[in-house]
Amino acid sequence: MIAHPEPLHIVIAGDRGVLPGLEALVYSTMRHNRDVVWHLLTMDIQVDHADGTGTGYYGISEEEAGWLRKIVTFMDHRSAFIRHDIRELYDRYLAQSVNRETGFTPYTALRLLMDKVLDTDRCLYLDADIIVQGDLRPPYEQWGHADYDYAAYTIPDACDGYGEMVAAVLVFNLDRIRYSGFLERARRYYNRNLYRYPDQMALRDAGDPAPLEETYNYMRDHKLADGKPVVLHFSNCNRYKLYTVPPGEFYRYYPEHKYIKDGLDVIRSVH
């Protein structure tokens, strides 16, 4: 009997607006990784503002999640995709945060609920503005069971030399977190302290991360990169985020990633 590796648990989050980014993330990840269990955190929600107005967000529906699931199972029949509607958990733990008016959507904070959603002992969180170009298991194996609560890339010498932790790619040691209370502290800071980058800074204040290598969160212009970074993070250093422009414009500027569009078209044609 062939022994299969332990599943790689990957968590993503977002509303309907980031679906183009998520499908590119899922496709590019599955091109290089097998035995993956995806966890999508989503919800419908309206955020009420101090001036009496409100902003409504639509979560990714079961039908839309079904399309992401088709991508996953088409590329690897042993992988799976699970949609988690976590509105109840959000209302219970995060809805009264002082950071509701910061301009970030509520979905950025959902990574603070990992210990309440998953029953696994570790997981890898990925933002929706990422393309994966290689194997994600090395950081998952290295830091998922290490003597740290989490691992993240930190920009050297940012923030007056202290370093700025970037929360786009995170390895969580959930087994350790459940007794250390790390995410419980992060939620408390997120709810009470007004931050520029709310959930990211709440995590950093709750505890220092293990050092994730830059190749797993490459934020600079990847057209100028030496070698091939494993994770491309389309931050402000890159021209476009995939989910903020029409896909055609993104792939015209980044023709090296058009294989994603072509691959998704093939999957659509057979389903």
Question: Can you say where each PLM-predicted feature lies in the sequence?
Answer:
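Short internal beta-strands
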Residues: 37-45
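Glycine/small-residue-rich pyrophosphate-binding loop that anchors the diphosphate of NDP-sugar donors
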Residues: 106, 166-169, 173
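Conserved donor-nucleotide/metal-binding helix-loop-beta segment in metal-dependent transferases, i.e.
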Residues: 130-162
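Short, solvent-exposed loop/turn segments at the edges of secondary structure
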Residues: 164-167, 227
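A glycosyltransferase accessory/donor-loop signature
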Residues: 1-18, 24-25, 33-34, 172-271
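Catalytic metal- and UDP-sugar-binding loop of GT-A-like glycosyltransferases, i.e.
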Residues: 126
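Active-site-proximal specificity loops/subdomain of glycosyltransferases
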Residues: 48-116
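Short aromatic/hydrophobic "clamp" motif used to bind/position activated sugar donors
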Residues: 123
